[in-house]
Amino acid sequence: PGMELSLFSRDAIAMATAVALSHDVFDGALLLGVCDKIVPGLLIGALHYGHLPCVFVPAGPMGTGLSNKDKSKVREQYAQGLVGRDELLKAESAAYHSPGTCTFYGTANSNQMLLEAMGLHVPGTAFVNPGGALREQLTREAARTVLGITRGQRFAPIGRVVDERAIVNAIVTLLATGGSTNHLIHWV
């Protein structure tokens, strides 16, 4: 199977988000997403209920583990039969060893950057590592922000925030930063 399953899982996440927000009991939504299809799915689902203020809370990238170069070397050795499955799993576990998005600038980290460019994150949160005091403060600030939007003079539901300017900002940011080409399928 190819990317058709990728879009299927994204759309399932979008539907689950839309159903969860459809109960008409919320004043706003704080959306927490990490990996490749989750964040686009949350965004699509939230836009189905564009009347709600929404703030996204990025996971941030996990700290550095085994380098991509070393991980690739072990994968190549495994493909050649030079190392066993245990060594491969050990390398994978060392590379992806903690909470957060992957350590490279792929789809998940591009998601975080694009949503910040669209104005859907607290500014400066896209690449703050999880688990630290700053991440905790920024998450609390996201909660205060969505509450402020729902109660304050600057009521801004997601359907008003995500307009053609926000989408252009996201695409320009994607191109300017060398973000993931997987976003072509999410933006079309």
Describe each region flagged by the PLM:
Residues 103-105, 176-182:
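Short helix-coil transition sites and intra-membrane helix breaks within transmembrane domains
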Residues 171-173:
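Flexible, glycine-rich loop/tail regions that form catalytic "lids" or insertion modules at the edges
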Residues 6-162, 166-169:
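Active-site cavity-forming subdomains of large catalytic enzyme subunits
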Residues 1-8, 182-185:
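Anionic-ligand anchoring segments at beta-strand to alpha-helix junctions in alpha/beta enzyme folds, i.e.
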